[in-house]
């Protein structure tokens, strides 16, 4: 949430409004998002990010992004949200320290070790729990809060009623996706990409196999035919813009 000054019934008051966070795959898109009103932008670096299919940001790009964003009173969140394997540990500490030195406002993380390391290093930046951890209830949110995180990004599977109920019970910052892909396998807990294309979804290689078109068979009989729309496991995107006033 962010505080803004508004005139209501002839009086100037401070009200809280949700922060509008947008993704960006390169510097041009980042600048457009901020100039058109985004309060913050989340981006992926060359390492430790699930956004590996995007062009992504070098450390020099991230520094330029931070300088541009801060000039326009916006924030930069960097995704460090892969699930770490042993060969991903090398260079992680140095990378986090560099992001902090550059002035990044927050990192978005999914692996518990990155949460722990960020706190151990006493970084100035915030630590946000990624939607990849499928957080859906108050007890889980309090667990992460006790670990010292600053924000929890809800699982996209949470419906409006649960979102409203949880918001009333916890004080920590909450973030929720209102537009974009709806992962059919609970926020990336999926092995389809590994199986079909040998690309690890939880290390940034998701080939979006759930969006491919499939023919359905029962034994030798095809259940969908050419005149029917091909079957896809994830054919819809989220679109909650009309729900924002709530």
Q: Predicted regions span which residues?
A:
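Conserved glycine-bearing catalytic or ligand-binding loops at nucleotide- and phosphate-handling centers
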Residues: 151
């Amino acid at each position: 949430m962010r505080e803004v000054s508004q005139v209501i019934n002839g009086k100037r008051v401070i009200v809280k409004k949700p922060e509008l966070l947008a993704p960006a795959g390169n510097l041009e898109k980042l600048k457009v998002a901020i100039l058109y009103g985004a309060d913050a932008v989340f981006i992926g670096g060359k390492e430790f990010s699930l956004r590996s299919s995007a062009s992504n940001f070098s450390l020099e790009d991230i520094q330029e992004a931070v300088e541009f964003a801060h000039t326009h009173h916006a924030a930069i969140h960097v995704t460090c949200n892969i699930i770490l394997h042993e060969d991903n540990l090398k260079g992680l500490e140095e990378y986090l320290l560099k992001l902090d030195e550059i002035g990044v406002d927050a990192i978005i993380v999914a692996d518990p070790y990155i949460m722990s390391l960020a706190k151990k290093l006493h970084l100035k930046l915030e630590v946000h729990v990624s939607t990849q951890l499928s957080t859906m209830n108050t007890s889980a949110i309090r667990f992460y809060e006790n670990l010292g995180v600053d924000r929890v990004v809800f699982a996209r599977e949470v419906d409006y009623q649960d979102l409203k109920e949880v918001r009333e019970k916890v004080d920590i910052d909450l973030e929720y996706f209102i537009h974009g892909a709806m992962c059919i396998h609970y926020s990336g807990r999926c092995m389809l990409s590994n199986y079909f294309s040998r690309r690890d979804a939880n290390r940034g290689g998701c080939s979006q196999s759930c969006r491919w078109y499939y023919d359905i068979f029962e034994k030798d009989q095809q259940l969908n035919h050419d005149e029917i729309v091909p079957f896809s496991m994830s054919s819809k995107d989220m679109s909650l813009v009309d729900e924002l006033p709530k």
